[in-house]
Structures are given as C-alpha cells and as structure tokens.
A protein has these predicted regions:
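Residue preferences within the helical output face of two-component receiver
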Residues: 85-86
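C-terminal output helix
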Residues: 99-108
C-alpha cells in the first residue's frame, strides 16, 4: 500500500478521490498546506486542485520543498487545455472528476514505473562509465 497526500482539495473532490484510491489499495491523507508535508507519513505523490487560481504557485512550492515528488493536478471537469497547462507547469499528471479506478490505477502505475526508472538511472550510468573505463 502506498501513501498519497491530498493537498488543499475541496471536501467533495477529496472524498471522491480518497474513496477510489482506497479501492486501489492506496492510503490517502488530507493536508492543507505544503508545509504540512513535513509531518505525518512519507508520501509517494501529492494531488492538488487545478481549480484553484494559484495551483501553479502550489506546484512551484512543492518542487522547492520536495524535489522529485510527483504532483497530480485534479479538477472537477476534465479539460484538455487544463491538462496541457498542468503538464506545462510541471505536474506529473492530470485527472478530472468523476474519478475512476482504471484512471487512478494507470496514474499510480505510471508514477511507480517512473520512480523505478529514475532509481535505476544512476546505477546504469555508473555501470556504463565503469565499462567504458575498462575498455578504454
């Protein structure tokens, strides 16, 4: 079971998202502020509201506070323009209500795959450098 944080989401969105995440075996906690991420369990991803006018600022604060932590932007209505804007602002992904199990399974799975690739990259680079030195 992984742990995710729902940061500043309105109650209706937070409740819907928590329910579906739990169905997919993810534990969700609710936080109000970026600084609250320092307290409580370690989180593997943060969901924030794209409906908030300052969500880009929240993304920026999260990147400063927790570099590399995936942030998923959520909204009440799926919208292609918002999706592209969220990705452009640095979000790992975007989803809109109503939340579906398959949708969240895919998002959480892609985050897990990305984390595995990132963790393997330094080891692979070290191995390639060592191989190059031994043949050089």
């Amino acid at each position: 079971m992984s742990h995710v944080t729902l940061l500043g989401l309105p109650d209706d969105l937070g409740n819907q998202l928590s329910r579906v995440l739990l169905e997919e075996s993810h534990q969700a906690s609710r936080k109000l502020y970026v600084s609250d991420l320092r307290r409580g369990p370690n989180t593997c991803a943060v969901f924030i509201s794209g409906d908030s006018p300052d969500y880009r600022q929240t993304l920026s604060l999260l990147r400063e506070a927790r570099p590399g932590l995936p942030v998923i932007v959520v909204s009440r209505q799926p919208d292609a323009k918002r999706w592209l804007d969220a990705l452009d602002a640095g979000a790992a992904d975007y989803c809109g209500a109503p939340f579906e199990r398959e949708q969240l399974r895919w998002i959480m799975g892609s985050l897990s795959s990305s984390a595995k690739l990132a963790a393997a990259a330094p080891a692979g680079a070290i191995a390639l450098a060592a191989a190059a030195r031994s043949h050089g």
